[in-house]
């Protein structure tokens, strides 16, 4: 019975990780804002701020999409191929996919948080204004996407730990003996 509980918990967190990584990539890919600034007189200037202007945020979208693919593949293999006979270069594939998804998600979240701090002026910037002063909604979306991405990474880690404790016939209830 305990093995079924661990497997159900792992499935739950795998589904959550897939949804959260997709949501983070979508929120970041739609992060843009038109900023209208006053020119002092009757003139006004405007410019657009978008995730595509920052390499780290473009990496975020790509990493989120790649981790979603890794999470979907791991979910399929975990749920459908319960015997875990799928191995690549003598390593079980599900833990490799879990590790890849975690790596992409944690690095993407870090890149987004760092970019948000740099774009937002940070504490060490010493400037009077930043992009986030004028485009607060853009920076808000970047922050939300980074937080969702971090939660997705934690979900993948929890799913991996739960699947490891699910048992499955190997010694001491451990499924993946590296």
Swiss-Prot record:
The keyword rRNA-binding does not apply. Residues 36-59, 107-141 are extracellular. It is a multi-pass membrane protein. Residues 1-14, 81-85, 163-178 are cytoplasmic. Pfam families: CASP_dom (PF04535). The chain crosses the membrane at residues 15-35, 60-80, 86-106, 142-162. It is found in: Cell membrane. Keywords: Cell membrane, Membrane, Transmembrane, Transmembrane helix. GO terms for cellular component: plasma membrane. Its main location: membrane. It comes from the Eukaryota. Belongs to the Casparian strip membrane proteins (CASP) family. Homodimer and heterodimers. PANTHER family: CASP-LIKE PROTEIN 1U1. This is CASP-like protein 1U1. The lineage of its organism: Eukaryota, Viridiplantae, Streptophyta, Embryophyta, Tracheophyta.
């Amino acid at each position: 019975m305990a093995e079924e509980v661990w497997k159900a918990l792992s499935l739950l967190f795998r589904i959550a990780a897939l949804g959260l990584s997709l949501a983070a990539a979508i929120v970041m890919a739609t992060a843009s804002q038109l900023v209208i600034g006053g020119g002092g007189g009757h003139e006004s200037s405007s410019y657009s701020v978008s995730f595509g202007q920052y390499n780290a945020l473009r990496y975020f979208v790509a990493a989120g999409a790649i981790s979603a693919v890794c999470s979907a593949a791991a979910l399929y293999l975990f749920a459908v191929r319960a015997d875990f006979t799928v191995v690549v270069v003598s390593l079980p594939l599900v833990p490799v996919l879990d590790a890849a998804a975690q790596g992409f998600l944690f690095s993407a979240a870090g890149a987004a948080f760092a970019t948000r701090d740099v774009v937002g002026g940070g504490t060490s910037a010493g400037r009077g204004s930043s992009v986030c002063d004028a485009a607060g909604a853009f920076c808000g979306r970047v922050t939300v996407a980074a937080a969702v991405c971090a939660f997705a990474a934690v979900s993948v880690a929890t799913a991996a730990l739960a699947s490891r404790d699910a048992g499955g016939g190997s010694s001491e209830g451990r499924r993946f003996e590296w």
